[in-house]
UniProtKB/Swiss-Prot annotation:
The lineage of its organism: Eukaryota, Viridiplantae, Streptophyta, Embryophyta, Tracheophyta. One of its GO terms (biological process) is response to cold. The chain crosses the membrane at residues 179-199, 241-261. Changing G352E: Increased resistance to a substrate-analog inhibitor. Fe cation 2 binds at E222, E273, E324, H327. It catalyses: 2 a ubiquinol + O2 = 2 a ubiquinone + 2 H2O. This is Ubiquinol oxidase 1a, mitochondrial. Pfam families: AOX. Catalyzes the cyanide-resistant oxidation of ubiquinol and the reduction of molecular oxygen to water, but does not translocate protons and consequently is not linked to oxidative phosphorylation. Increases respiration when the cytochrome respiratory pathway is restricted, or in response to low temperatures. Fe cation 1 binds at E183, E222, H225, E324. Belongs to the alternative oxidase family. Residues 1-62 form a transit peptide. It is a multi-pass membrane protein. CDD domains: AOX.
Amino acid sequence: MMITRGGAKAAKSLLVAAGPRLFSTVRTVSSHEALSASHILKPGVTSAWIWTRAPTIGGMRFASTITLGEKTPMKEEDANQKKTENESTGGDAAGGNNKGDKGIASYWGVEPNKITKEDGSEWKWNCFRPWETYKADITIDLKKHHVPTTFLDRIAYWTVKSLRWPTDLFFQRRYGCRAMMLETVAAVPGMVGGMLLHCKSLRRFEQSGGWIKALLEEAENERMHLMTFMEVAKPKWYERALVITVQGVFFNAYFLGYLISPKFAHRMVGYLEEEAIHSYTEFLKELDKGNIENVPAPAIAIDYWRLPADATLRDVVMVVRADEAHHRDVNHFASDIHYQGRELKEAPAPIGYH
């Protein structure tokens, strides 16, 4: 009797729980039908289907349709998980969990500004911009020479003269390759001096008087000389190896020299620029004699120095020689400032001196 009553109660519980599903007049809808009907009748509302388990029917599943606008435990859980991941990524990237932070996986693909020339055509160079171009002052005095008067001046002068002999022996009259080698060396002092002045400005919490910018401009100008002559002279493999060796030695030597005596370092660069003027003068003589072909100027040189479209290699050598004369003046001026017992910041730097 007790077993019969217990069985009846269990059966009643099963009927109450399963009745709405087993004895409902509503037809079960498949996933395909649910998606099709929802799209046809309610094009603005997207439907999806999920599987649900009956509470007391072991292993039985039924399909039902819901709209995406309705909240379900599964969707709320997914949304919370994504929110947590975004906050975690943003916190790792920004160093905190500030509200509104957005995690970025990569910054690749920053779009540059579109730049055009004065005539409206597209600017094709990425290594320099139109506002960095200029017309070289070729009327500058090329024959000026600083007479060495002090012991350091004489050391600087004869150091540069001693470097000329192996250069003449190696390159002889191959002035294109000679110019390439010269520019790989001449581009180092401005960068070293600007870097050391930059660190000094940070260390002392003081301005540089514009000399950081002036020296870095010099280094960039010399680098553009190299990029230009690379279009004219194609260096051989052993010349490239020589460039690596010479640049490595000269960079470290000039770095130490500038730390020990800036006035000596600038004086030596001034004499080095005087030798560069001499080399480019000889280059022009060979062009005028016809020993070197006066080929059309590279496109990069025409845009950088604002040369006419029909400019030739001779025009390029002329403007490069004028640049070297300006660098000569800047470095002798910097050395004179130090000789007077003053710092570079006390005298205005010749920024934009071309």
